[in-house]
Swiss-Prot record:
Pathway: Amino-acid biosynthesis; L-histidine biosynthesis; L-histidine from 5-phospho-alpha-D-ribose 1-diphosphate: step 2/9; Amino-acid biosynthesis; L-histidine biosynthesis; L-histidine from 5-phospho-alpha-D-ribose 1-diphosphate: step 3/9. Pfam families: PRA-CH, PRA-PH. It comes from the Bacteria. GO terms for biological process: L-histidine biosynthetic process. Keywords: Amino-acid biosynthesis, ATP-binding, Cytoplasm, Histidine biosynthesis, Hydrolase, Multifunctional enzyme, Nucleotide-binding. Residues 1-126 are annotated as: Phosphoribosyl-AMP cyclohydrolase. This is Histidine biosynthesis bifunctional protein HisIE. Its EC number is 3.5.4.19, 3.6.1.31. Transmembrane segments: none annotated. In the N-terminal section; belongs to the PRA-CH family. In the C-terminal section; belongs to the PRA-PH family. Gene3D superfamilies: MazG-like, Phosphoribosyl-AMP cyclohydrolase.
Amino acid sequence: MSHSDLPLANAVPLDKIRYNDQGLVPAIAQDYLDGTVLMLAWMNEAALAKTLATGQVWYWSRSRQELWHKGATSGHFQKLLGIRYDCDSDALLLTIEQKGDIACHTGERSCFHQLDGHKSPPPADMLTELARVIGDRRDHPTPESYTCKLLAGGDNKILKKIGEESAEVVMACKDDDPEAIAGEVADLFYHTLVALAHHNVDLRAVYRKLGDRRR
């Protein structure tokens, strides 16, 4: 793959990127599906050029003082899908597809998996976070939880609620009530996420299908 064949590659003004006094620029890798920040590393001019030329992400290892092909050892390669630079041209944001869904050398999905020294999932978009909470309710049920009661009721209870919420979305739209529409769509999204959890369908599989729809 040539530099010009890579999506957005020609939009990166290599001569305008501002490197620090060590010849490096910080590069943030972000998951293309749910926006999770996966890692922060560094690039020099050679790493950025190699990334654009190959379509796979290369960094500069400050400890080893050499180019670092992400995933060359672990198999957790990063496929570059997009790249942006900030307003000062001294930081890069890489939109990537993370192979193996693991970016951190510890085996965690994201390097940002700790909060105040304690393990915590990285922040993501609202639907992803809600899906995570629902999955946690499924795996660690509590009797007072509405979500747990829905899951315990199985398809009959969950699908009945989806049908009810779908009808309420239709009625809110017919009434042209923006606030009601937002509320009913939120309820429909929530109950649909419960159905996904019940059937062990990862929300990112849905995101991939949505990505296919926009092509």
